[in-house]
C-alpha cells in the first residue's frame, strides 16, 4: 500500500534523528563518503520506503570487504541502503536540443558565453532590489569554464544569425558567480543588456510562472522538498521532465565540458531525483 505524504514526512523526521546519532560512526567506515535520508532503491528503481542512504565511491560484493568494514543493513531497526555517489556529465542528454530564439527572455532556454562552444540553460531572472537591475541566473559551468571574466557577453541562443556578422543575439554580460573552488553551488548571474531589461518574463518555458518562496521567522522555507516529492525541470537539451525526489541532500559528482576537456566537481546537499516522464521537444 502506498504511503501518504504525511506518513513519509513522519518517517523522514524519525530517520533524520537517527542519522544524527549514527552518522559519525558510519563515516568512520572505509569508503563511506556521505550519509543522508531518502528513498530506498532496488534494481535502479525507487520505492516508497524511507531509509538511511550511505554513499560510497564504488560498491563491492560483500565477500570482498573485510568483516570489520561491512556496512550494516540496519541500525536500530532503521534500514540502510548503500549507493554509489551519482555521477553525471552535463550536456550528455540524448534529446534533440532546443536552439530556438525566445523573446521575451524566459527560463529554460539555451544561452552561451562568447568564449564557449557549448550551450547551457537559462534558469530564471533575478532582481537586484537595491539597484533595480535585472540579471539572468544560470550555472557557473554554463558561463565560466572557458576563461570568461566579468563583462564578457552572453548570447541567446547565440550571438549572430549566420551568415551575417551581427550581434543581435547578445542579451547579457557576466556579472558575478559562486567561488568554484570553495562554494557548494554551481551558479552565476549576468546583467541583462539595456534593451533586454524590460524584455523578459517570470516564467520557465513549458512549466509556467515562478512563484515566491515563503519563509518563516527564521528565514527557513516553509515548504521544503522532501523524498518522494514530485519535481519538474525544463532544460534546453532535456526538454520538460518530471521526476521524483529520491534524496534532497545527496552528494553528486558532475562533469563539465571545457576547452581543456572534462572537469569533475563534487557537490553535497544536492536534490537527487529520478525522471519518470520526459516530454519530447519536437
Spell out what each predicted region is.
Residues 276-282:
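Extracellular low-complexity, Gly/Ser/Thr-rich intrinsically disordered linkers
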Residues 1-126, 134:
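Noncatalytic regulatory segments and standalone regulatory/sensor domains
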Residues 76, 262-265, 280:
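Short non-domain terminal segments
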Residues 95-275:
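Serine endopeptidase catalytic core focused on the charge-relay Asp
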Amino acid at each position: 500500500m502506498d504511503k501518504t505524504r504525511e506518513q513519509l514526512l513522519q518517517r523522514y523526521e524519525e530517520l533524520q534523528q537517527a542519522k544524527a546519532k549514527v552518522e559519525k560512526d558510519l563515516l568512520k567506515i572505509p569508503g563511506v563518503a556521505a550519509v543522508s535520508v531518502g528513498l530506498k532503491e532496488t534494481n535502479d528503481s525507487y520505492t516508497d520506503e524511507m531509509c538511511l542512504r550511505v554513499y560510497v565511491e564504488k560498491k563491492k560484493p560483500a565477500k570482498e570487504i573485510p568483516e570489520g568494514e561491512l556496512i550494516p543493513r540496519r541500525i536500530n531497526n532503521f534500514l540502510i541502503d548503500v549507493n554509489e555517489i551519482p555521477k553525471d556529465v552535463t550536456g550528455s542528454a540524448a534529446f534533440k536540443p532546443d536552439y530556438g530564439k525566445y523573446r521575451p527572455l524566459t527560463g529554460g532556454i539555451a544561452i552561451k558565453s562568447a568564449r564557449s562552444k557549448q550551450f547551457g540553460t537559462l534558469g530564471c531572472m533575478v532582481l537586484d532590489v537595491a539597484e533595480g537591475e535585472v540579471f539572468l541566473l544560470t550555472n557557473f559551468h554554463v558561463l565560466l569554464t572557458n576563461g570568461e571574466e566579468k563583462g564578457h557577453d552572453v548570447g541567446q541562443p547565440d550571438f549572430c544569425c549566420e551568415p551575417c556578422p551581427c550581434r543581435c543575439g547578445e542579451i547579457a554580460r557576466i556579472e558575478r558567480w559562486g567561488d568554484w573552488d570553495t562554494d557548494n553551488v554551481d551558479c552565476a548571474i549576468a546583467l541583462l543588456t539595456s534593451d533586454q531589461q524590460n524584455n523578459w518574463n517570470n516564467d520557465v518555458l513549458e512549466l509556467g510562472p515562478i512563484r515566491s518562496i515563503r519563509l518563516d521567522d527564521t528565514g527557513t522555507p516553509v515548504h521544503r522538498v522532501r523524498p518522494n516529492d514530485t519535481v519538474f525541470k525544463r532544460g534546453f537539451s532535456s526538454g520538460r521532465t518530471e521526476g521524483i525526489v529520491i534524496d534532497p541532500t545527496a552528494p553528486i559528482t558532475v562533469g563539465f565540458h571545457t576547452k581543456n576537456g572534462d572537469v569533475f566537481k563534487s557537490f553535497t546537499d544536492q536534490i537527487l531525483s529520478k525522471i519518470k516522464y520526459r516530454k519530447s521537444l519536437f
